[in-house]
């Protein structure tokens, strides 16, 4: 089976198993804390995806660590290795700002990209595997799902990999987003979406256009990897996540209309939750251990009432945990970093590399290397990072270095900061900017400051002093010593 041609999650799991990337766990393990402990140890060791076939107290298997290595993220995106994700980024950059062909030859050069675009439309099915089993009304019971409790002080079991499908009242296109959902009853979940996210924006538009009416929502669990990854990738606003998933997979995304609303969900998903949000129905969410390594504070979010649960025969429950990096979101961040680079370079060609260290919670700190061309150039780039893609709206720190620095080597970055920066001159502070609601270090929830560090060599106009020249070895001497190095036998 080709990684480019998997059809659904089960095909992908077969592919992983063939390559030694999936381990089946037959020993009974408790979704309350125990699965997290095993998954965490496995991820930190770079281990396989885990399919817990006998979770204690449940008949449904639990899939964890699906994207626990960058390699598996790349495979989910239809690529053989992480480096190939740069090509995905180039395609997204092209789709974000397509350029018309400059001539006949250029048209032929662009044909592969245009051919990929032809795979974009979805394929609508009348019936689908995700609707093989149906529960509605009093038969709806979310407690039958093996929803994990990840950390000792978590408020309740938490759905983590739910792909939430919404549509605003004035939009033709649906929005797909991944928002955690706290289990509070047999048919009740808390939908934790932040105000700037697509689902929350759709809901706010609905409230304004149709006050008092229930807002339709559906959640897909266990969708195919391309569709899941499409929801966490910087897809252009003009492109749907389903269409992007089709590009990754090489085939059109198959969808089916829900039973209780007009939303379209992935036809091959393992489980679908259908329901609504009643305007004004809110509940306190949390606390939960999160990707920061801390428990977040309790806050109020809308309640999602589930009216239907549809699923495949022998459905698989897809889950994960979040905690201090490395965790699965951090691994996703490392892989998606390669997608971001070409998108940024399309807008800012002077950028050489861009790196989001996973230990910085994958998005709170960015290191940029660039070919500096004029005084003040580094500040333009840091402002561009904050404003160009909404994925970096919450990036608190941006460090800009010259292209002789390796953005992914802290030794290099720290050297540049300590030798090329004056703290007063080269630090930019911006107050009252959007900040992650989970960032308890900010003085106000959702609002805080940002810091830019210009660790580039300074040009005339930025300094009046003679600037230092880096030490460079004599290449002829290096070559002579290379030739006699083994003969010296220093380490033998």
UniProtKB/Swiss-Prot annotation:
GO cellular component: cytoplasm; cytosol; plasma membrane
Enzyme class, spelled out: lyase
Keywords: Cell membrane, Decarboxylase, Flavoprotein, FMN, Lyase, Manganese, Membrane, Metal-binding, Ubiquinone biosynthesis
Entry's cofactor comment: Binds 1 prenylated FMN per subunit.
Membrane topology note: Peripheral membrane protein
Chemical reaction(s) catalysed: a 4-hydroxy-3-(all-trans-polyprenyl)benzoate + H(+) = a 2-(all-trans-polyprenyl)phenol + CO2
GO MF term (any one): metal ion binding
Entries under Gene3D superfamilies matching the protein: Single helix bin, UbiD C-terminal domain-like
Binding, prenylated FMN: 178-180, 192-194, 197-198
Localization per Swiss-Prot or TrEMBL: Cell membrane
Needed co-factor(s): prenylated FMN; Mn(2+)
Pathway(s) this gene product operates in, as recorded in its UniProt entry: Cofactor biosynthesis; ubiquinone biosynthesis
InterPro entries in alphabetical order: UbiD, UbiD-like_C, UbiD-like_N, UbiD_bacteria, UbiD_Rift_dom
Pfam families xrefs: UbiD, UbiD_C, UbiD_N
Listed GO biological process terms: ubiquinone biosynthetic process
Entry EC number(s): 4.1.1.98
Source organism, top-level taxon: Bacteria
Binding site for Mn(2+): 175, 241
Described function: Catalyzes the decarboxylation of 3-octaprenyl-4-hydroxy benzoate to 2-octaprenylphenol, an intermediate step in ubiquinone biosynthesis.
Quaternary structure (record): Homohexamer.
Stated family: Belongs to the UbiD family.
Name this protein carries in UniProt: 3-octaprenyl-4-hydroxybenzoate carboxy-lyase
UniProt organism field: Salmonella typhimurium (strain LT2 / SGSC1412 / ATCC 700720)
């Amino acid at each position: 089976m080709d990684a480019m041609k998997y059809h659904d999650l089960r095909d992908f799991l077969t592919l992983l198993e063939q390559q030694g990337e999936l381990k089946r766990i037959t020993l009974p393990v408790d979704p309350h804390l125990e699965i997290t402990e095993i998954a965490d140890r496995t991820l930190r060791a770079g281990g396989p995806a885990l399919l817990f076939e006998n979770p204690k107290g449940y008949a449904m298997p639990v899939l964890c660590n699906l994207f626990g290595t960058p390699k598996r993220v790349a495979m989910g995106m239809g690529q053989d290795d992480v480096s190939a994700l740069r090509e995905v980024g180039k395609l997204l950059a092209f789709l974000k700002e397509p350029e018309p062909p400059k001539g006949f030859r250029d048209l032929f050069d662009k044909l592969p990209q245009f051919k990929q675009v032809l795979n974009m439309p979805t394929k609508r099915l009348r019936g689908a595997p995700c609707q093989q089993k149906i529960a509605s009304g009093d038969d709806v019971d979310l407690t039958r799902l093996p929803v994990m409790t990840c950390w000792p002080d978590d408020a309740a079991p938490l759905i983590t990999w739910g792909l939430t499908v919404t549509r605003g009242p004035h939009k033709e296109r649906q929005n797909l987003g991944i928002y955690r959902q706290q289990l509070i009853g047999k048919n009740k979940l808390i939908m934790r979406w932040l105000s700037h996210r697509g689902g929350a924006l759709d809901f706010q538009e609905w409230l304004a256009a149709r006050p008092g009416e229930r807002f339709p929502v559906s959640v897909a669990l266990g969708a195919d990897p391309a569709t899941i990854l499409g929801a966490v990738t910087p897809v252009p606003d003009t492109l749907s996540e389903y269409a992007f998933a089709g590009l990754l997979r090489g085939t059109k995304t198959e969808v089916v209309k829900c039973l209780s609303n007009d939303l379209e969900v992935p036809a091959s998903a393992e489980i679908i939750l259908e329901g609504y949000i009643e305007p004004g129905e809110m509940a306190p969410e949390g606390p939960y251990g999160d990707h920061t390594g801390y428990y977040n504070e309790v806050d109020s979010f809308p309640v999602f009432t589930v009216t239907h649960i549809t699923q495949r025969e022998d459905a698989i429950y897809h889950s994960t945990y979040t905690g201090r990096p490395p965790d699965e979101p951090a691994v996703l961040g490392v892989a998606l970093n390669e997608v971001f680079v070409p998108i940024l370079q399309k807008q800012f060609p002077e950028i050489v590399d861009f790196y989001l260290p996973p230990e910085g919670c994958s998005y709170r700190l960015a290191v940029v290397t660039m070919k500096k061309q004029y005084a003040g150039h580094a500040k333009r780039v840091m402002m561009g990072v904050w404003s160009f893609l909404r994925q970096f709206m919450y990036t608190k720190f941006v460090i800009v270095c010259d292209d002789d620095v390796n953005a992914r080597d802290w030794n290099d970055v720290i050297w540049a900061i300590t030798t090329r920066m004056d703290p007063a001159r080269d630090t930019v502070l911006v107050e009252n900017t959007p900040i992650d609601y989970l960032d308890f270090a900010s003085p106000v929830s959702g609002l805080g400051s940002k810091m830019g560090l210009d660790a580039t060599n300074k040009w005339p106009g930025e300094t009046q002093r003679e600037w230092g020249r880096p030490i460079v070895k004599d290449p002829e001497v290096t070559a002579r010593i290379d030739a006699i190095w083994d003969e010296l036998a220093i380490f033998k």
